[in-house]
């Protein structure tokens, strides 16, 4: 029975998570198992997954790193979890996202239900008629440099579910299998490509940026899509002062502004 398990995770939650993962498809992780292969014994696979998850015995495997070429010649590391791990991450996401959505800032647009990049662009266009200067903010290697203790502090502030915090902490510590097969440990960051990563990234910047802006620069409206931000200022001096403050703020939180992509300008 579900009630006999240490954590109140139901078979229904695992089933619903599986259905969402199946719709999203995705490549195989380090175990090489495809979604089609998982489906070959889906009932048994989901039962075993639920049993480990509700018992507190689920341990995330390593994440498979795939390097995606970028237009500037560099590569973007993408983390591919196993099918089972994607399902477990979706279980946690389905519990945590409804808690966080009402808390998140209205001008945070990335990876959120009912919001899009087009919404952010439309809002920015409207504000550009009222403000003459913008500060474009980009965080260098954001996903790879998220501070684990700060993120876990934010998670604990938003949920009392011990198992949610426990599994998020395990994911943050899960190693990465590099393209050459070597295993790398992680002390910072959350892999791009994980089901839970975008939600955790938004939670991190909710405190590092959104709430900080409300407290210290409440007269500066902004649109944020993940780690890309447009801030609207009345003057060059205001934009430059905001840049200095943000640089210090991000440094305090273990992040760095991208030197080429962060800039201010007259509209």
For the regions a protein language model found, what residue spans apply to each?
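Duplex nucleic acid-engaging cores and interfaces of nucleic-acid transaction enzymes
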Residues: 84, 88-91, 125, 152
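Conserved phosphate-binding loops in nucleotide/dinucleotide-binding enzymes
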Residues: 77-82
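Non-catalytic, polymerase-adjacent accessory regions of viral genome-replication enzymes
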Residues: 1-43
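Conserved polymerase palm-domain catalytic core
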Residues: 52-67, 71, 103-267
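Short, compositionally biased low-complexity segments
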Residues: 10-26, 62-65, 94-99, 129
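Short alpha-helical scaffolding segments that buttress acidic/His motifs in well-ordered protein cores
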Residues: 17-21, 91, 167-172
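Electropositive, glycine- and tryptophan-enriched low-complexity nucleic-acid-binding patches
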Residues: 89-107
């Amino acid at each position: 029975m579900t009630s006999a398990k240490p954590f109140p995770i139901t078979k229904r939650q695992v089933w619903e998570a599986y259905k969402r993962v199946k719709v999203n498809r995705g490549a195989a992780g380090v175990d090489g198992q495809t979604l089609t292969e998982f489906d070959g014994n889906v009932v048994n696979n989901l039962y075993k997954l639920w049993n480990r998850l509700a018992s507190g015995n689920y341990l995330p495997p390593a994440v498979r790193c795939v390097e995606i070429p970028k237009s500037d010649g560099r590569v973007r590391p993408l983390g591919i979890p196993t099918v089972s791990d994607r399902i477990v991450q979706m279980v946690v996401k389905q519990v945590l996202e409804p808690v966080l959505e009402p808390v998140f800032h209205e001008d945070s647009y990335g990876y959120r239900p009912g919001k899009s990049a087009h919404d952010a662009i439309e809002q920015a266009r409207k504000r550009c008629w009222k403000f003459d200067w913008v500060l474009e903010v980009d965080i260098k290697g954001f996903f790879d440099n998220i501070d684990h203790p700060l993120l876990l502090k934010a998670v604990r502030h938003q949920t009392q579910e011990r198992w949610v915090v426990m599994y998020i902490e395990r994911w943050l510590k899960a190693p990465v299998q590099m393209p050459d097969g070597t295993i790398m440990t992680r002390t910072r960051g959350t892999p791009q490509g994980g089901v839970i990563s975008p939600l955790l990234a938004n939670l991190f910047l909710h405190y590092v940026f959104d709430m900080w802006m409300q407290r210290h620069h409440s007269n500066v409206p902004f649109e944020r899509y993940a780690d890309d931000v447009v801030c609207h200022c009345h003057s060059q001096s205001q934009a430059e002062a905001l840049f200095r403050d943000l640089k210090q703020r991000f440094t305090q939180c273990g992040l760095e502004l991208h030197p080429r992509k962060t800039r201010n300008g007259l509209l």
